[in-house]
From Swiss-Prot:
EC number: 3.1.21.2
Organism: Glaesserella parasuis serovar 5 (strain SH0165)
Protein name, entry field: Probable endonuclease 4
Obligatory cofactor(s): Zn(2+)
GO annotation, biological process: base-excision repair
UniProt keyword terms in alphabetical order: DNA damage, DNA repair, Endonuclease, Hydrolase, Metal-binding, Nuclease, Zinc
Biological classification of the source: Bacteria, Pseudomonadati, Pseudomonadota, Gammaproteobacteria, Pasteurellales
Length: 281
């Protein structure tokens, strides 16, 4: 089964993300469980938690279909001790919020070395941050998102993801989310069915499909290997649509959230239908 949805707004309460997903015909969704541009947020209220769980049950969303995203402020590889501690504390809070909502995944951008420490040191800090978080909060899997490689962001090479996972002690509590725009911008060609075969074979060899816990399905405004992260709609931009056909007809992408973060929310329902039309039963 393909779980397809979008990163919907949780404005007015996280329970509203469920209803907004139903409106666009989704059977998956992503959300922020707090304001993504603030360090701290009020705790989730009991009635909010109850409504979220009830709405998920009524509309048949299981935890496997929901991919929460953490705050953009968090940098789990921060070279500065004070800011690293602040990021780790915020990440644990994000994990705790997911656990309170009955969710089992938390998607995050791995981190940046800020040109102050080596890549290896930064990757080790990210892995240590994951170890601390999963020791602090039960049930929730830390899902590392591949990046486009802008600036000093790590996670744009499969080897970065593999190196983090290797240093995480509990392999059951770590996974990966692949973003198609980020893959392309990082230099992984996914513009044809043949190049998709090669790129995802490389992913399986270096990281392993057993760690794939979600996908972000996005077009790109920039060229292959641009190292610039600019999302586009599915059918516009530089990647083309073969990658989406590949994903929709490959069992490796079954039963994980396939999440749109494309730039026109008003056509998300149409894009979900487009993806479903690519399935060759």
């Amino acid at each position: 089964m393909k779980y397809i949805g979008a990163h919907v707004s949780a404005s007015g309460g996280v329970e509203n993300a469920v209803l907004r997903s139903v409106e666009i015909g989704a059977n998956a969704f992503a959300l922020f469980t707090k304001n993504q541009r603030q360090w701290q947020a009020p705790p989730l209220k009991e009635d909010t938690i109850e409504k979220f769980k009830r709405f998920c049950q009524v509309h048949h969303f299981s935890p496997a279909q929901i991919l929460p995203h953490d705050s953009y402020l968090i940098n789990l590889g921060n070279p500065e001790a004070e800011n690293l501690a602040k990021s780790r504390e915020a990440f644990i809070d994000e994990m705790r919020r997911c656990d309170q909502l009955g969710l089992t995944l938390l998607n995050f951008h791995p981190g940046s070395h800020l040109n102050k420490i080596s890549e290896q040191d930064c990757l080790a800090r990210i892995a240590e941050s994951i170890n601390i978080a999963v020791d602090s909060v039960p049930n929730v899997v830390a899902v590392i998102e591949n990046t486009a490689g802008q600036g000093s962001n790590l996670g744009w090479r499969f080897e970065h993801l593999a190196e983090i996972i290797e240093q995480v002690e509990n392999k059951q509590r770590v996974g990966v989310c692949l973003d198609t725009c980020h893959l392309f911008s990082a230099g992984y060609d996914i513009s044809s069915l043949a190049s998709c075969e090669q790129t995802f074979a490389d992913f399986d060899k270096v990281v392993g499909f057993e760690f794939l816990r979600g996908m972000h399905l996005n077009g790109s405004k920039t060229l292959l290997a641009s190292r610039v992260d600019r999302h586009h709609t599915l059918r516009e931009g530089t990647i083309g649509t073969d990658v989406f056909k590949f994903i929709m007809n490959n069992a490796h992408f079954d039963n994980i959230p396939l999440i749109l973060e494309t730039i026109e929310p008003e056509i998300w329902a149409e894009e979900i239908n487009f993806l479903r039309s690519l399935e060759q039963n």
